[in-house]
């Protein structure tokens, strides 16, 4: 009896062992097959054609977004009219820009840091993270952020001021993209950032001299890259001329972007908070200004605010002023005569007709632009 029990136990163990060996063998073959599949070279073509789709429920349309689409990038030194520019474009029914992402310039700066460090580049290459791999990843990442941080639209634009420090790189990633470089009198930009306490990485808000030096360096970098990609891809937009003659400049600008004219771009203030209109952030410093129609109230606020020693050295501190067409010794320069409609807008603004809507009333946090 005991002997028979031992035989049965031995037989059961043998069956279990056989089944286990068979299962492990099948599993090993499957793993080997998967490893072989993974070892096959990846078709780079598939990684280069990342497509995102967006559904516009109101218009019942689906849009396909990809690296070859005509993206629009708006940039410049902060306090140069980039928010006004994007608000005017956002008022166009076919264009969506939206608020600053803050992510895009940071990831671009990180990529620049990797490229500049020869040691880091060697490490990345050794790890198989080549320029081609990084570029493909950057394309997908940037497109994902631009597409998904707002509503779908036929044309998408991004407004992160310092993103244009990587203008030539963006032009390579998105070959059909176009760039709008906002240019403003550096004295006005610097006075605005100091008086409104807009913290910008590397700018000492206690020193007009330091801020003007940093302004000069930043705008020179972006201007040179704009010139490098050429006038067919990058357009300089002077803030002063945009607010003095908005219709003339918006018609020129939309023609450059190859987007049909729409009169709503001249009345962005009427589209704020509306579906498909202008979405504003409660914490961006320019929000309280772009709720107003285009006006010339901010053109010469800097006059009388800059220390005399800085004014005296202006041409040396900020040589880009002259290069961009501003007289470094005129206080203020003669920017030009505004259109009649702009004179009326400015009168209404001074009367206090335009106040911040309740849904945008929140004390802004200290904003740092990088």
From Swiss-Prot:
An MF annotation (GO) of this entry: protein-tyrosine sulfotransferase activity
Compartment(s) of residence: Golgi apparatus membrane
Effect of residue 60 to A: Loss of one glycosylation site. Loss of N-glycosylation
Site keyed Transition state stabilizer: positions: 159, 286
UniProt key word Ligase: no
Glycan attachment points: 60, 262
Cytoplasmic-facing ranges: 1-8
Binding-site residues, 3'-phosphoadenylyl sulfate: 79-83, 184, 192, 196, 239, 286-295, 301
EC number(s) from the headed UniProt entry: 2.8.2.20
Disulfide bonds: 97-157, 226-234
UniProt xrefs under Gene3D superfamilies: P-loop containing nucleotide triphosphate hydrolases
Annotated consequence of substituting residue 262 to A: Loss of one glycosylation site. Loss of N-glycosylation
Membrane-spanning residues: 9-25
Keywords from the UniProt entry: Disulfide bond, Glycoprotein, Golgi apparatus, Membrane, Signal-anchor, Transferase, Transmembrane, Transmembrane helix
Keyword hit for Cytoplasm: no
Domain of life: Eukaryota
Top enzyme class: transferase
A biological-process GO annotation: post-translational protein modification
Post-translational modification remark: N-glycosylated.
Function per UniProt: Catalyzes the O-sulfation of tyrosine residues within acidic motifs of polypeptides, using 3'-phosphoadenylyl sulfate (PAPS) as cosubstrate.
Family statement: Belongs to the protein sulfotransferase family.
Annotated protein name in UniProt: Protein-tyrosine sulfotransferase 1
Gene: TPST1
